């Protein structure tokens, strides 16, 4: 609905003002929309962010057209929107920080291991864990040896199904997230970074903990 509203706002500005600024703003919004919806490999909220300045300008231009004596009232909805935006930012920060914290905990836990520590997935955890020597699991180029550790982040991508008869479970680590808002948690419909996780830029719901499964190769 927000997307429809933005497009309607753009076309309304073009129809009413018919000036160079309207054309520029229209191309800005429509160009970003076409790229994000039709050319990017995945529909994500962040690919729509480049149109944010243009949308803000369109909103201000729309407010200027209002001649109502209560014109200031149009700004009141921005206050709760600002609060929600800040809460979303905090939730997203906490989600990102769990990757760094999980990496720190696993480093302390397995730094004395004689075998190799392998990790699945991508994104932040992949980056932080590699800094202390964990290796990405790629069965086409390397096979874990007996006694090696494999860490599997649940809320992640490109996970490899491990044969149960070849590994033994050691532990499941959980890290708490922001309690009722998330931008990218599997099963909540929130897919800010990729629509593969869901169609929503964020979700207000009960947010499960980030989980990391740890197994040892038999």
Regions found by a protein language model. Name each.
Residues 1-9, 22-26, 30-67:
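Hydrophobic/aromatic-rich transmembrane helices and adjacent perimembrane loops
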Residues 200, 210-217:
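C-terminal functional modules
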Residues 1-17, 37-38, 84-94:
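Transmembrane-lumen/periplasm boundary regions of multi-pass, lipid-linked membrane glycan transferases
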Residues 29-31, 120, 209-212:
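Sequence-level motif detector for i,i+2 pairs with an aromatic at +2
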Residues 39-41, 65, 69-206:
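Catalytic lumenal/periplasmic loop and adjoining terminal transmembrane helix
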Residues 14-28, 73-74:
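Membrane-interfacial loop-to-transmembrane alpha-helix junctions, especially the N-terminal start
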């Amino acid at each position: 609905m927000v997307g429809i509203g933005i497009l309607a706002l753009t076309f309304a500005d073009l129809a009413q003002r018919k000036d160079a600024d309207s054309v520029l703003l229209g191309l800005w919004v429509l160009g970003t929309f076409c790229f994000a919806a039709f050319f990017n490999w995945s529909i994500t909220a962040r690919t729509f962010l480049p149109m944010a300045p243009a949308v803000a300008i369109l909103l201000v231009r729309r407010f200027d057209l209002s001649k109502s004596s209560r014109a200031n009232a149009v700004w009141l909805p921005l206050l709760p929107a600002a609060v929600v935006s800040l809460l979303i930012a905090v939730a997203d920060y906490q989600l990102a920080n769990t990757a760094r914290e999980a990496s720190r905990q696993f480093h302390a836990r397995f730094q004395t291991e004689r075998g190799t520590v392998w990790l699945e997935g991508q994104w932040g955890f992949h980056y932080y864990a590699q800094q202390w020597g964990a290796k990405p699991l790629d069965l086409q180029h390397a096979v874990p040896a007996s006694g090696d550790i494999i860490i599997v982040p649940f809320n992640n991508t490109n996970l490899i199904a491990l044969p149960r008869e070849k590994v033994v479970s050691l532990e499941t680590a959980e890290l708490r997230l922001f309690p009722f808002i998330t931008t990218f948690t599997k099963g909540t419909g929130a897919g800010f970074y990729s629509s593969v996780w869901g169609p929503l830029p964020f979700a207000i719901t009960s947010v499960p903990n980030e989980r990391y499964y740890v197994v040892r190769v038999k």
